[in-house]
């Protein structure tokens, strides 16, 4: 029984955004995260001096009031929706839009997607364009993009193998549990909770939290608001906290983490993070700069600031409210039973295996992946052509790197690029056509590096793809004692951690930044062409550094 039935009743009758103070209290973490509350009785769950009959009468009275209030609200919303739908269908604007859509279809004209899918709220944006009354389901990923920069003056799949940790009969028994016998007793409430649950699942807004430096604690996590645009909310109301922000997105919860706080906490910030420098941030205090984080850095922020706890509490509160009181009671009882018998930590049941299967792992240091063995065998007597830096190439560097070419990410195509002299067809890489590329994984990278780290004379390279359709790419080229890395964001491995393992060698790292998947593929090919010039000594490292410092380039260069 909730402590405050009036508050619960208002939550069903009010707007979708929860009360700020109530939500802060509901998502507040205890000071000691290791303190166990399972054995502590909850004294505030019911009045201590009430008799059983009085308690039942109170429950019945409050339940009737709640049911009446919910029915009234649902009826009001249903009436309003029907009125709006009828008005829209009969309005001249809707008929005009429908006629315009039919005319456009008959004429076979094409329009850019941006004209139809524009999210702009400005009245001027619709002038001169046809309005199309086209029902469309807006998928969440379209709204998940984080703007790199906003201004206060302007704003007011991964291919995996699935493994299980429980026997199939246990899994089937868990998922086949029948709740109907219990739920039929409260059928009317189940229908209302189903409506709430459907609205909850289809909601596309975000719960926004701000992670900032605390007055009495090292940091604090504050609930901001339930909004459709997290960056606008932060820019309008929290820009004074810090105008440089790391954005941690966990489904429909977004954490806006202060850049200054991360730096003060001594957390290592990856070198490819592309937030503005201190001088620019101070010079433009009304501009907010946002950097979405993922993979290893995201895991670090989640662990350090306990964001997983805030996400779990937020999800529990909103989900339990959506399914209703009776269903919540059954679910919590079931969860507590599973916690008691420890089955909660072996179910459910399906885990994504990020590492290669065991049979692909090398059994000892003398075992080699077929891919690595072929590279070492067929590149044994090959060397990258060597020339002299020329002013003509330096002056045309950007043009050479960004011009279209027939280069693909096949091993033979990259081999022809790197081992044939620039501007010629020498057929130096014919032997490498026999190399069969394999899918990338961490063990394969480590084995390639281990075979090459103590060889000071060989020239070779490896190309790897991770993540199936996501097409995350990694290229490593070796010339003598030096390694050249081309990479973007790779979910399965950390390039920086790998480089630290091979400190004996010199590493040149080209990190692709601030691009989508398609641009990442294009820029990876561009950097391969840049690497050709560098390996063949046609340009100097100073030229590479100067090119990477340009404002419109999509990569950063670092020597380790």
Curated annotation (Swiss-Prot):
InterPro entries: TATR. GO terms for biological process: viral genome replication. Pfam families: TATR. Keywords: Early protein, Transcription, Transcription regulation. The keyword Repeat does not apply. Regulatory transcriptional protein, which trans-activates gene expression from early baculovirus promoters. Can also trans-activate its own promoter, suggesting that it is autoregulated during normal infection of insect cells. Belongs to the nucleopolyhedrovirus IE-1 protein family. This is Trans-activating transcriptional regulatory protein. It comes from Orgyia pseudotsugata multicapsid polyhedrosis virus (OpMNPV).
């Amino acid at each position: 029984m909730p402590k405050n039935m009036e508050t619960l009743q208002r939550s069903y009758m009010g707007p979708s955004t929860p009360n700020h103070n109530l939500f802060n209290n509901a998502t507040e973490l205890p000071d000691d995260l290791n303190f166990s509350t399972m054995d502590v009785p909850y004294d505030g769950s019911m009045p201590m001096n009430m008799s059983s009959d009085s308690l039942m009468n109170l429950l019945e009275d409050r339940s009737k009031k709640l049911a009446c209030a919910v029915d009234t609200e649902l009826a009001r919303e249903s009436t309003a929706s029907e009125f709006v739908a009828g008005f829209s269908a009969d309005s001249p604007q809707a008929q005009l839009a429908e006629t315009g859509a039919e005319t456009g279809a008959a004429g076979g004209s094409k329009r850019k997607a941006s004209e139809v899918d524009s999210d702009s709220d400005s009245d001027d944006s619709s002038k001169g364009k046809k309005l199309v009354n086209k029902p469309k389901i807006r998928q969440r990923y379209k709204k998940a993009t984080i703007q790199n920069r906003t201004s206060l003056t302007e704003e007011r799949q991964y291919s995996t193998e699935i493994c299980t940790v429980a026997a199939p009969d246990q899994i089937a028994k868990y998922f086949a549990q029948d709740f109907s016998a219990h739920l039929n007793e409260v059928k009317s409430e189940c229908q209302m909770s189903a409506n709430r649950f459907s609205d909850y699942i289809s909601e596309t807004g975000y719960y926004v939290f701000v992670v900032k430096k605390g007055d009495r604690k090292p940091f604090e996590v504050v609930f901001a608001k339930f909004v459709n645009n997290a960056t606008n909310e932060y820019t309008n109301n929290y820009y004074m906290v810090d105008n440089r922000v790391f954005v941690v997105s966990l489904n429909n919860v977004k954490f806006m983490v202060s850049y200054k706080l991360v730096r003060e906490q001594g957390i290592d910030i990856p070198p490819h993070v592309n937030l503005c420098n201190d001088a620019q941030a101070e010079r433009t205090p009304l501009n907010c700069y946002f950097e979405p984080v993922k993979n290893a850095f995201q895991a670090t922020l989640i662990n350090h600031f306990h964001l997983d706890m805030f996400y779990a509490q937020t999800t529990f509160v909103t989900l339990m409210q959506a399914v209703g009181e009776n269903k919540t009671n059954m679910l919590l009882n079931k969860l507590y039973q599973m916690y008691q018998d420890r089955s909660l930590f072996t179910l459910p049941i399906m885990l994504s295996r990020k590492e290669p299967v065991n049979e692909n792992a090398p059994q000892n240091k003398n075992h080699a992946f077929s891919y690595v063995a072929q590279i070492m065998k067929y590149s044994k007597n090959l060397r990258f052509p060597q020339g002299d830096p020329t002013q003509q190439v330096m002056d045309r560097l950007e043009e050479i790197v960004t011009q279209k070419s027939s280069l693909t990410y096949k091993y033979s195509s990259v081999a022809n690029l790197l081992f044939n002299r620039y501007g010629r067809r020498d057929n130096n890489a014919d032997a490498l056509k026999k190399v069969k590329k394999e899918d990338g994984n961490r063990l394969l990278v480590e084995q390639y590096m281990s075979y090459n780290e103590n060889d000071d004379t060989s020239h070779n390279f490896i190309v790897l793809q991770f993540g199936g359709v996501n097409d995350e790419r990694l290229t490593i080229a070796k010339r003598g004692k030096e390694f050249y890395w081309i990479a973007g964001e790779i979910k399965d491995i950390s390039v920086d951690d790998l480089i630290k393992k091979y400190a004996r060698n010199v590493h040149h790292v080209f990190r692709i930044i601030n691009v989508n998947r398609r641009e990442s593929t294009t820029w990876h090919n561009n950097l391969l062409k840049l690497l050709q010039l560098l390996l063949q000594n046609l340009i100097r490292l100073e030229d590479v550094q100067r090119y990477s410092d340009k404002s419109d380039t999509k990569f950063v260069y670092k020597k380790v």
